Every structure is written in structure tokens, then in C-alpha cells.
Amino acid sequence: MGMFDIIGPIMIGPLLAGIAVAARIGLMARHIFQEEPKKADIIVYGSFAKTYRGHGTDRALVAGILGIGADDVRLRTSFEIAKERHVEINLHPSDAEVRHPNTVRIRLTGEDNRVLEVLGVSLGGGKIEIREINGFEAVLTGEDHTLMTFHHDKPGIIARVSTLLAMKDINVSTMRVFRSGRNERAVMIIATDGRVPNESVEEIKKIDGVNNVITILPL
């Protein structure tokens, strides 16, 4: 029996703060994927790999992927819930060297075989970062309203997105663009001071070269 079985899901203390962080990483992956996956392949590294069972990190990651938050009592039965929902879970530790000691790689597969792969890290103090999305470098913290575009790298897209946001008086706090190469695939991550309205999201989707647009609320 692990510590989580004894104390339960109340999020207090540094040990259970780690559970909350793991749930946030799983939730962020779920929000980016925008649907419940049919399969989740999870690899934990570093400290996560050494303590993921006894500390409840495994259940927290699965809970987040299922859309269950750290303060939800269902977290402790996340594996059973995944089975009920017919979500296949494969979780393995790895001793491979990584840049950060608390790292997890999550690969989600949907009903249409669409795949999302993210790399997330725990920074301590309850903070997380998603540092890779489908092979792209990324910086996602879950602390802001976020707009993400998946698009073809071509002139004018960044300007048009910025203009559409300005027309709705949406203030941009940060904007980062990552691309696989010139005139190739690109991801733009925009943190805003407020939620981007649905009509603006639909307008951005119509921009030539934009493949997908998603919005993420603060966790």
C-alpha cells in the first residue's frame, strides 16, 4: 500500500503536491488532444520513474488524461475508470537520461488513430511545463488562457492571427512560434489575458495554411 492509499486524495504536503503536478500534466495533454483517447502510452523518467507507484503519480497521470483533476476523489481509481471507459493504458518507467529529473512522455491515440505526443516536466512548487508537442519545442504552463495554431510556415499567418485578436481587444501576453523548418510545419502558442471567443477561433481556422486551432483554459 502506498502513501496515497493511506492519506487519500486531499492535496496537502510536498508528497501529494507531486500527485497534483502529475494530474496537471495529464490534464494538459488531454486539453491539447481535445478528446478522450482510446489509448495512452506513458513513459516516466527520473524521479517519476523511481516513485510513480508508491506516490500515486501513475494514477494522477491517468486521471488527468481522463479529464479528472487532482482534487477529484476519483483520482485514486483512475485505472479502473480507464478500464470502464475502454481506454487502454500502458505505463512504463525508463532509466534513459533526460534534461529534467521529473519528466513524463505521453502519447495519446484517438478513435481515428490521430496521435498526440507531449513531453511534460514538473518544475517544483506545483508548476509544470509542456516542452514538446509532436516533436516541436514548446512552452506551455497551464497558467494562462492559451491559443494554439498548427499551421504551415508561410508569410502572413502570424500577422493575420494577431490582427484578428486585436479586433476583439484581446491582449497578448506572450507569443512563441516553433517550426520544423522553413516553409514546413509550425506551431504558434499565444498566451492571452482572457479567453479567446469562439467566433475568433473560427475565423483563425479559415486562414489559408492553418490546419487546426485549439484554446486551453488555465488549469
Where does each model-flagged region fall?
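Short, hydrophobic/aliphatic alpha-helical segments
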Residues: 1-10, 40-42
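Alpha-helical scaffold segments in soluble metabolic enzymes
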Residues: 5-6, 24-32, 60, 64, ...
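Conserved phosphate/anionic-ligand binding catalytic regions in large, soluble enzymes, centered on
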Residues: 9-26
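Non-transmembrane, aqueous-exposed alpha-helical and coiled segments at domain scale
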Residues: 33-41
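A structural-propensity feature for long, helix-poor, extended segments
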Residues: 41, 45-84
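Short glycine/threonine-rich loop-to-helix capping motif typified by GTGT followed
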Residues: 51-57, 101, 189-191
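Contiguous domain-boundary segments centered on the initiation and propagation of an alpha-helix
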Residues: 68-116
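A conserved regulatory-domain signal marking ACT and ACT-like small-molecule sensing domains
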Residues: 77, 89-94, 118-219
